[in-house]
């Protein structure tokens, strides 16, 4: 069902880490994002998401970064997200 896999890393206060599965789960649920483009996503593990071809890694990173920053996950700083196809 899912056509591609993304490796998702977050940068918080200059430190890189795999995005926690809990954050990916919450973000990919439509009632949190209210965006249909994230409907066809499946968080698999820390730092790993499967997605349809409707979604680009760049758009996923942009949306997740804004969402994490809005929720204060960056400890007062913007959260930078990198997503790439694996």
Predicted features and spans:
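Charge-rich, low-complexity N-terminal segments
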Residues: 1-86
């Amino acid at each position: 069902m899912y056509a591609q896999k993304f490796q998702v890393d977050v940068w918080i206060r200059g430190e890189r880490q795999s995005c926690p599965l809990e954050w990916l789960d919450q973000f990919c649920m439509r009632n949190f994002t209210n965006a249909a483009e994230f409907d066809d996503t499946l968080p698999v593990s820390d730092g790993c998401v499967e997605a349809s071809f409707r979604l680009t890694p760049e758009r996923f990173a942009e949306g997740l970064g804004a969402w994490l920053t809005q929720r204060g996950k960056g400890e007062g700083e913007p959260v930078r997200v990198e997503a790439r196809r694996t």
